[in-house]
């Protein structure tokens, strides 16, 4: 037996017991004739003591020579610490060591293995196996495990079966780019890695598996950002014989179960619901952060027609009221203007108005507006003395709302309104079924081609497809879309109509999705489902800024695994075996 206990479990109740611990040397401290070693494993840290008054000199000499991250085994007696450490669970005890074996030496690590480390992101990703030794990173993995366990418990209790679906599938043209895999046995043909198990879970519904789930890897070849990775994990679910209310109730229940068991937060009230139209109108986003108010107010009627050309020519003028932010300095306001002018936001400028203590309004465009008009602005914004009104305008309504959304989030962060330990949950419903692409002059599915239109909107498919609402829904928490889904089309004729509107010829639809349309001919039940992003859930509960920090071996923002140096070139022999030839990149 290598060890009798872990480095996180010993307490005063274990005094005078002889124990054996194994782990990594966190740090070594020498004080007079004593050497203190902090020994760390997955479970915690325990202090070891090598005392020259009671331990062999040879043992104490070896203890002094220990280096950081050496792997050792130590046997000794549990003693009460004279100088206790209240910051760790084992802080009341220490081990008076009588025997020690060095199991493996370590080179000096390239960064400190501490919560507050001196290693940058790139260096820590290159040595991810060392980064995972840090308590803060390891705790994210433990949280991920507990959440996956609770998901399985809840869904099993609701009668769901966990069923695995294939990883090598057929490539489809909709959505993000596929990762493709050449087939050696079928020259010139390719598999794709699944962007989701969408079609397979629908086939499982046709097969009679009325409640399915799996925690599954998915792959999308798209540009990366803080909440995206080329491979990510979904909690994928589907149900038969359900309407939208059944799905929302089931998975709202799962969310509440996770809050209760993981965060110890009891949520009794139903999640609010907001239409997509209202989310875009009042927040400029289909995933609004409702931890704080600051809703958009349209100001076209108030501010147009006063010889201020920026507003007079605008297709949209919108404002937010930042309560209590009237004390913002000119420097802070200039910084906000610079923020909205950044290429990532794209606004041309920002107008502000401050409500003074006497109720008067002072703005950055006073020469164009009378105090009477500014008071009308104040009333429209419901602003009070000490408040700050921030206004953006533009010639594209949707684009300007998105810019105002970025400004709202930035101001909310500056005012401390986006507390990571406060949670605001809601459902966003009634999405458009289609979105129009001006460049290609065609409709695209806002979610995917299998999303059902709302029954009352089906007649509009022939007359006004852009007005059709989808039977789709997203769960949003703190401005993060943690999950989304829809009621699916289960009728072959309606599915064919959907393909036509998306520009598929009957031949193309049959080639891409014939297997699904054929299955629908054999008694497909009404069905719908939802997929949660496990990575996003974990990062939300852990208070992380990026999902990368809750994935054991993530990719960087260029989609590379710098630890194993992937992707990489392959041998010419492998290329020939796969009937592939590389074309030089002329860029």
From Swiss-Prot:
Its EC number is 6.1.1.12. The gene is aspS. GO terms for molecular function: aspartate-tRNA ligase activity; ATP binding; nucleic acid binding. Keywords: Aminoacyl-tRNA synthetase, ATP-binding, Cytoplasm, Ligase, Nucleotide-binding, Protein biosynthesis. PANTHER family: ASPARTATE--TRNA LIGASE, MITOCHONDRIAL, ASPARTYL/LYSYL-TRNA SYNTHETASE. This is Aspartate--tRNA ligase. One of its GO terms (biological process) is aspartyl-tRNA aminoacylation. Homodimer.
């Amino acid at each position: 037996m290598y060890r009798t206990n872990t480095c996180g479990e010993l307490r005063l109740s274990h005094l005078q017991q002889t124990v054996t611990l194994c782990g990594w040397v966190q740090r070594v401290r020498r004080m007079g004739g004593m050497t203190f070693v902090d020994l760390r494993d997955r479970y915690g840290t325990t202090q070891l003591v090598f005392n020259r008054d009671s331990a062999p000199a040879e043992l104490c000499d070896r203890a002094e020579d220990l280096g950081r991250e050496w792997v050792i085994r130590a046997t000794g007696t549990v003693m009460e610490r004279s100088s206790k450490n209240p910051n760790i669970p084992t802080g009341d005890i220490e081990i008076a060591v009588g025997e020690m074996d060095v199991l493996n030496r370590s080179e000096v690590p390239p960064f400190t293995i501490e919560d507050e480390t001196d290693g940058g992101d790139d260096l820590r990703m290159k040595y991810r196996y060392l980064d995972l030794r840090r308590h803060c990173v390891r705790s994210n993995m433990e949280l991920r495990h507990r959440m996956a366990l609770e998901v399985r418990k809840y869904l099993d209790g609701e009668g769901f079966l966990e069923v695995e679906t294939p990883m090598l599938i057929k490539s489809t043209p909709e959505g993000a780019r596929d990762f493709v895999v050449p087939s050696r046995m079928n020259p010139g043909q390719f598999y794709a890695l699944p962007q989701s198990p969408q079609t397979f879970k629908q086939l499982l519904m046709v097969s009679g598996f009325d409640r399915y789930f799996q925690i599954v890897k998915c792959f999308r070849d798209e540009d990366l950002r803080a909440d995206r990775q080329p491979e990510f994990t979904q909690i994928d679910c589907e149900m038969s014989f359900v309407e939208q209310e059944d799905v929302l109730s089931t998975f709202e229940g799962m969310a509440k179960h996770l809050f209760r068991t993981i965060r110890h937060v009891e949520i009794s009230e139903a999640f609010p619901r907001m239409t997509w139209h209202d989310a875009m109108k009042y927040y400029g986003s289909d995933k609004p952060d409702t931890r704080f108010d600051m809703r958009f107010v349209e100001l076209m009627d108030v501010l147009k027609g006063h010889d201020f050309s920026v507003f007079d020519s605008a297709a949209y003028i919108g404002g937010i009221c930042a309560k209590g932010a009237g004390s913002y300095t000119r420097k802070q306001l200039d910084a906000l203007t610079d923020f909205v002018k950044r290429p990532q936001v794209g606004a041309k400028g920002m107008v502000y108005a401050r409500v003074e203590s006497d109720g008067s309004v002072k703005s950055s465009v006073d020469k164009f507006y009378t105090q009477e008009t500014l008071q009308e602005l104040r009333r429209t914004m419901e602003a009070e003395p000490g408040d700050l009104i921030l206004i953006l305008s533009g010639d594209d309504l949707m684009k300007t709302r998105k810019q105002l959304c970025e400004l709202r989030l930035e101001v909310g962060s500056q005012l401390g309104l986006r507390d990571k330990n406060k949670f605001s949950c809601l459902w966003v419903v009634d999405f458009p079924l289609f979105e129009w692409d001006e460049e290609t002059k065609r409709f695209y599915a806002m979610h995917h081609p299998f999303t059902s239109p709302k029954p009352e909107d089906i007649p509009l498919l022939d007359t006004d497809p852009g007005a059709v609402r989808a039977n789709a829904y997203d769960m949003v928490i703190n401005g993060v879309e943690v999950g989304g889904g829809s009621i699916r089309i289960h009728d072959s004729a309606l599915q064919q109509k959907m393909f036509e509107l998306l520009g598929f010829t009957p031949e193309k639809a049959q080639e891409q999705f014939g297997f699904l349309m054929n299955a629908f001919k054999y008694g497909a039940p009404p069905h719908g489902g939802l997929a949660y992003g496990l990575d996003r859930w974990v990062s939300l509960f852990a208070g992380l800024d990026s999902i990368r920090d809750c994935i054991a071996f993530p990719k960087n923002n260029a989609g590379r695994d710098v630890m194993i140096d992937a992707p990489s070139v392959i041998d010419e022999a492998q290329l020939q075996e796969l009937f592939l030839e590389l074309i030089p990149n002329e860029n």
